[in-house]
Amino acid sequence: MLEIKNWDNKTWISSRKYIKSFNNFVLKQKKLNKSSKILDIGCGRGKIIGTLSSRLRLKNKPLGIDITSHKDKDKRIKFRKIDALSFFSTNKIKFDLILIKQTIHLLNLNEIKKLLNLLKKNLSPNGRIFIFTLETDNNKLPTFRLMKTRLMKSLKRDKKILKIITRLYPYRIKKKFIYKVEIIKKNYLKMIQNRYISTLLSLPKKEILKGVEEINFKYKNNIKFNDKLICVILKNAY
């Protein structure tokens, strides 16, 4: 599995405004309270569920799992360095919310099918699974040419993943989370150099530098776009 170390490190995704907007979206779709048990698969630094914990005043810390352990993890969460399939092989907890935000595409298709079957077995009776992926059509992320090519290939695979989810959970609910991004170009260039998205991970440094030059020429100093995510909501009674 690929490790994305900087997706939530000094990006709009780590901003208070984004996290508040994201958590507002989640809570609009699923009622949670201080007794709720929450799991975030691929939690990164855990800022999203950490903030959610404070907002709900959770009795028990939300659990975040990831294959990368960051030194600056949110202290409001309980963290385990483990992959999802290994975690569920021994887990006994029934969760009210399982969150998978922009990480399911890092698994191979067989692993995804196994994970989807395991998820419902680890939900409470009224629990929900939220799976977020990038918008697969007309995606507006600022890109350079090679990044765009790789992103389109990745989004094509995401469509396959969404079809697999629909086959296993035919009554799933589909929503969209849209966040209006406004970022200074030099900050976005740093994100590119830090390989904030999986499509950049395997690119040689030479191609990254070319891409930085291309984006620097292509975009204005203040970059504005809509960051769109597809949210698939699954429940226990399928």
What are these regions (language model features)?
Residues Q102-L106:
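Short catalytic micro-motifs in class I SAM-dependent methyltransferases
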Residues K113-P125:
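A short glycine-rich, Lys/Arg-flanked "PGG" loop and its adjoining helix->strand segment in the class I
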